[in-house]
């Protein structure tokens, strides 16, 4: 233990010492638990719940609850939690992130904290990266939970809403981040409370927490409806962009920006038969041209997206997975569809949106697990208030992480990778090769095929075969090429379960991991390395890098340029240099910082709309929960009358005509506003008299239609009006974000401008909701 402790942060070391005291208590209960029957172990659940009712806390019953789970895990799964797994479980219960190396049995770690927190009856959500893992983990762990009297459910895509609702009612619910997030949005669009599927967001345990809370945090969840625009403009813009030359546009790959030059603008004006492309009336055309440029010059097929069944599918740059149901926004997806000659689907209109940051912050308690979180600890703390605790490994890591081999050109690098694969393959040692894109994995695959080397390819195009391919990657002679191993969730066991073969693979040195390029994030590189050397197994990792790789080319700076000039140009000569290694790491840190800024910016924008979202969703929930909204309706009426009085009656000359005309046109029935001696009354007296008349008019309506019918009408009208205006508002806020981004608000803080303009728009939204609701209710018969 002391050897491992020495490599942990001092703070973590202190934390682990404290946690070991709790684990000692759990260990002390092990013998007494062995003597209990299945029925007696199950009865402990009712005993724990009763103790909680009487005022004990989850922390009070933790040692016993963990000891119960450990015993049931042994009996049902044939697996006993190690001390380090119990430590990880306590960290998770405490609402922190447990950083545990690959192969340390993270799935078994979560069982005890899941059970403990499910005792509250408020539900626990176990969140993972795809449906396969959600269903697998649910099936794997259900025997433990069910034998303790807990119900277990799973949320998967395209599930019937009634089944979905039942799954959420379970004590423990497995599912993916996007399914939980989209259900939250959909629940806040339902016309009736019975259509909601989720209950309160109590406790979430996020597996591969860095992948979900960091990598995916740049892409907000969006529910969209079809827009009503002309799709021909995408085809025209696409035809034009095919004619442009390099001098017609300026491209910055580092910042991913592109714009027409003066010659490009002139060419566009000639192509479209207009005199001034930058005139305000041509803003829509300019936008379409710009998106077509981005689609052609910045977005690459088999890198950023793939074509599957005639559709453009986005590839997650961090995991290499196809992102089902996601579309690029602001017309970029349609521009790519035009470029690839597939069906162009209508520009979607945003109806509901939330970032992962703001969704996960809705949980009463949040925690997670991953093999790599320390590099992003600052982000976890500042955005999610989550501390990261490094959990020691059960056995020391003995994997050899070799120095990078660096080449001048990409071609030299790939030739060397193929040579290394051939050399290692002759020994029969299994090899895992990590690539950064579908395109690169297929390039390497072709090179190996030319040499007659049998291998497997795992990328966004083979998503359905993922688990099967990975499960065999540790066998003798196996060569597996994988796009970004991040979040794969399946352990690579040496020998794939065959004990004799496992020993043979160990004797050969375990799994050999080759990285063909440094990723933008050091964390993703560490995840690839961590596929090897699990549970004290031997293993080796090495990265092959070229000075033409994106991270080095875009972010390497002057150090790399100098190194390029100094090194010899001999073919296939690897450059080995401490300065170069440091430069690569500096480049990666630079990109990580930049990506953090992007995610912070996404959150800054969403924080503005998040406050508005809370107000609107609370309003909807009041209606759905059958709360009396009579007072709210009357307040709306009062506000409309007050605003009218302040607009038309305050000043040197009172505009009685304007005042009454406005109220008649807004909601009051004709000839009802008869106020004797109006010119002798104060402004407030006129407003109060008007309000009293409006109340009498509404009371008369209730008598005619019946109180119950009017109450039902109020709810129906308010829901419809809120939804209609909120959807328009969200879409307008999305457009405002794009507009502010384009204008860049010279000398102004774009986030401040967005917040200020967003506030004004929200005030206008509330005014529109008030007037439309009151108008419908007063004028409906």
Curated annotation (Swiss-Prot):
It is an enzyme of class 7 (translocase). PROSITE patterns: SECA, SECA_MOTOR_DEAD. InterPro entries: Helicase_ATP-bd (IPR014001), Helicase_C-like (IPR001650), P-loop_NTPase (IPR027417), SecA (IPR000185), SecA_CS (IPR020937), SecA_DEAD (IPR011115), SecA_motor_DEAD (IPR014018), SecA_preprotein_X-link_dom (IPR011130). It is a peripheral membrane protein. SMART domains: HELICc (SM00490), SecA_DEAD (SM00957), SecA_PP_bind (SM00958). GO terms for biological process: intracellular protein transmembrane transport; protein import; protein targeting; protein transport by the Sec complex. GO terms for cellular component: cell envelope Sec protein transport complex; cytosol; plasma membrane. Its EC number is 7.4.2.8. ATP binds at residues 85, 103-107, 491. The keyword Transcription does not apply. Part of the Sec protein translocase complex. Interacts with the SecYEG preprotein conducting channel. Has a central role in coupling the hydrolysis of ATP to the transfer of proteins into and across the cell membrane, serving as an ATP-driven molecular motor driving the stepwise translocation of polypeptide chains across the membrane. This is Protein translocase subunit SecA 2. The gene is secA2.
